[in-house]
Amino acid sequence: MHRLRNKATLITGGTSGIGLATARRFLEEGARVAITGTNEGRLEEARKTLGDNVLIIAADAGSVAAQEDIARQLGAAFGKLDAVFVNAGIVDLRPLADWSEAAFDRSVAIDLKGPYFLVKALVPLLSNPASIILSGSVNAHMGMAGTHVYSLAKAGMISLARTLSGELIGRGIRANVISPGPIDTPLNDKLGLGPAETKARANAVVGMVPAGRFGTAEEIANAVVFLASDECRFMVGSEMLIDGGMNIM
């Protein structure tokens, strides 16, 4: 069953983790796929993994100019866009006292400002119907120390799904947000922790999850396929929490 047959799609941050898993699933479901990333080496590895039919775009997720260039490249390659998964982001965790203005601006640029201006640039390409899928987080609903800037950006994405839907649904464009809990992806390796700290953190996180484990990138990707498909046409401005029950604690 090809639920995304011939749909033109974009996945930002598509070189690893949830983004790469979603690109695989989109291809399996018959979609035409473009992905973005910042690291040239990982972009090339993704090309090898996904195949030469995938459009690979190098782009800084926090740059407004880069988002506009993504739209230009997609317009030239696809002419239209049926679904976009705005997945690129960073997780910068630190105590309140350790935040500088520069660090704050960079984190918000990648996790909120860039996505906002990407959607703005893509709207002229979006079909009727079309699906915008934003990346939120269970952290937006929790008061976890050190997640200040990440959580506020993700709360912004949850709100953005609603306001975009309010403005665009008349054109057949729906926006929803998927909010994962702790997922076992390479992003966890970018926190700068040593092996012992990483293990201790993982154990602490799992202790907060009623399901008793990390989620997988594939579990999130399966949900994104649903949100991108025509099965989801009556779901508008909603949030899908996939967190092993973490939000109920």
How would you label these PLM feature ranges?
Residues A8, T15-S16:
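Conserved glycine-rich cofactor-binding loop
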Residues A59-D69, E101, E218-E219:
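The beta1-alpha1 cofactor-binding region of Rossmann-like NAD(H)/NADP(H)-dependent oxidoreductases
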Residues P95-L96, A103-V108, V205:
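Substrate-binding pocket helix/loop in short-chain dehydrogenase/reductase
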Residues V119, A153, A161:
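Active-site helix of classical SDR
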Residues P124-L125, G166-G170, R233:
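Alpha-helical segment proximal to the catalytic Tyr-Lys
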Residues S137:
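Residue(s) in the substrate-gating loop at a strand-loop-helix junction
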Residues M142, V225, C232, V236-M249:
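Short C-terminal tail/terminal secondary-structure segment
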